[in-house]
UniProtKB/Swiss-Prot annotation:
InterPro entries: Phosphoglycerate_kinase, Phosphoglycerate_kinase_CS, Phosphoglycerate_kinase_N, Phosphoglycerate_kinase_sf. It comes from Paracidovorax citrulli (strain AAC00-1). Keywords: ATP-binding, Cytoplasm, Glycolysis, Kinase, Nucleotide-binding, Transferase. GO terms for cellular component: cytosol. It catalyses: (2R)-3-phosphoglycerate + ATP = (2R)-3-phospho-glyceroyl phosphate + ADP. One of its GO terms (molecular function) is phosphoglycerate kinase activity. Substrate binds at residues 25-27, 41, 64-67, 118, 151. This is Phosphoglycerate kinase. Monomer.
Amino acid sequence: MQILRFSDLCAQGQARGQRVFIRADLNVPQDDDGRITEDTRIRASVPCIRMALDAGAAVMVTSHLGRPTEGTLTPADSLAPVAARLSELLGCDVPLVADWVDGVQVQPGQVVLLENCRVNVGEKKNTPELAQKMAKLCDIYVNDAFGTAHRAEGTTYGIAEYAKVACAGPLLSAEIDAIGKALSQPARPLAAIVAGSKVSTKLTILKSLSDKVDQLIVGGGIANTFMLAAGLSIGKSLAEPDLVSEAKAVIEAMKARGAEVPIPTDVVVAKTFSADAPATVKAATDVADDDLILDIGPQTAAKLAAQLKAAGTIVWNGPVGVFEFPAFENGTKAIAQAIAESPAFSIAGGGDTLAAIAKYGIEKDVGYISTGGGAFLEVLEGKTLPAFEILHKRANG
């Protein structure tokens, strides 16, 4: 996808002395006392801000935090803790500016944090009045927030329509490149792992991927519904019997293309859903009426691992079992290790997937780890994200 990149503007000296407005994703979790409990997103925003400062720009940064009521800023909605953390990471003062829509004082070489953008009236609905006011604040607009790229809001879309220059920051550029590499021009075979508790939440993804991928590996509650579609008994496992026909349609669509949905041949079951429930490996044809399927079995895990090691590209969204329980983590662990050992380009995303990657320490062995939950899922659904669309439009005339 052709877009203007902020790194190129900086390299060409076009940001010197310019007012740069960066939309970052600084929406971090906090405890009841307002202390930041996990700062990955803040750390991830630093390279773009530093790039702008090093280029001699006057830098404004904003983000949303939570879901505030438009027009009202409460202490809980304030970016004050984020400003403090940013100043530590950047090694310079980062003043926090409230009521900033009508004007911001900032000099080249300085950075200010503009208070929670979702407090501004018109942000969520992307009103032209707000977008035009924000565009007047800057010479260059930079979107570096992939996590909100699927939302057409004032700071993610509207401002990009009216700003003199609209471009992508390093984080957003990396996401665009990785997604293109995995889905637009993938090295074959292309394997996708789509797992989770419900087919209903991922049905669009399953359908979209079924005409692109060579192997569509399903896991978790989704796999149980596919096992029902294949005529297997799943006992009292979590599934959606009303979506069996949809699962069958995905299986048939894949088969018609010479591709496959590998159905588990063995599973790990228990009688209750608990960490200390005795785990039993069974053939997929031997599941009893009172069994709960909580993981794929070793035979299935080995087969899938072999497929992943032979893949050219891997897309991973979701653990294949209840990996939080040691007795039912082996399937997800085997998948994670196979991805780590595979020469394939891999892209992974989604909260549980990131937790599994961290648990098995394979961060450095995954080609690209996507930070955007909902945005990543919409890409897998085959949608063009609003933030990508407007930057592409601006870059092409």
